[in-house]
Amino acid sequence: MFKRSFLTLALAATLSTAAFAGAPQQKTSAPGYYRMMLGDIEVTALSDGTTQLPVHQLLQMDADKVRDKLAEFYRQSPLETSVNAYLVNDGESLVLIDTGAGTLFGASLGNLIKNIEAAGYSTDDIDEIYITHMHSDHIGGLITGGERVFTNATVRADKHDADYWLSQQQMEQVPEDKRGGFKGAMAALNPYVEAGQFKTFVAGETLAAQITSVEAYGHTPGHTMYRLDAGDQSLVFWGDLMHVAEVQFDQSSVTIAFDSDQDEARKQRVDAYADAAKNGYYVAGAHLPFPGIGQLKSDDDAYDWVPVNYSPMW
């Protein structure tokens, strides 16, 4: 009797344990893309990943004040910062805006290609690539192992940025420890130059897919925003107009160490914020939390960020 009861209890315990065992944690994220329609044009935000930025050291502002401002938003420094790119499909051409960091920043970045594929495209589908500027986290994804990733694409960039970053003469005018950016730009772009797949433009030029280049010099000598117009709707791709939403939407005058011309970068940001808030169009930021698309609303001397509302496309 005791033996039978013991076996019954043991079996019950085993079944009970199996029934209430927790499911294994998956520890994976959904694919890093977000899709929306702007009029009849499809826009896909693509995540290259995130990186930790010591923004208390990088922002041109007292470090303790930066930490205090971040704390208001339950954030801290180093700040996990998104690196975003964008794909524009007007039904005739497929345009990629920026390419992420590639292999240059470690495993937390370099996810652009797999997210392009998750979004239903391949690198061979890309017709043109518009570079906002030639910092490595925007052009690193152009190559892998020294070879072109986007074999069918023409890469476009503002002439001022190309003339600066791709110039051996310009590089030789800066100290040796400041030449990494030049070398990285040359490594990423030269394979396209040699293949006849690189073309510059001047600010204000209308490019493919109803996209117009917009001068935003300051962060780099040829930093460019891109304006996409679709009927009565518009979206402006900001590039690196700003980096830290928690600080720079409240205090648009705060610059960052990456800005090559601090005064001009500040002016461009102040003007762009005011225009976006006044006209209510969408903006997309390379370092705003993914997907980085939203609108600005003025709030006295500051601005409120209104992220795009999620709208499924099924």
Range-by-range predicted roles:
Residues 1-21:
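Gram-negative bacterial Sec-dependent N-terminal signal peptides
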Residues 48-49, 99-102, 134, 160-161, ...:
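Active-site metal-binding loops of divalent metal-dependent hydrolases
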Residues 40, 88, 98, 126, ...:
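Divalent metal-coordination and catalytic microenvironments
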Residues 227, 231-314:
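Cap/insert and terminal regions of metallo-dependent hydrolase folds
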Residues 85, 91, 107-156:
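Active-site metal-binding motif and surrounding structural segment of the metallo-beta-lactamase
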Residues 31, 54, 134-141, 164, ...:
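Active-site environment of divalent metal-dependent phosphoester hydrolases
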Residues 22-23, 110, 117-121, 125, ...:
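Metallo-beta-lactamase
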Residues 29-119, 225-242:
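Conserved beta-strand hairpin/beta-sheet module of binuclear metal-dependent hydrolase folds
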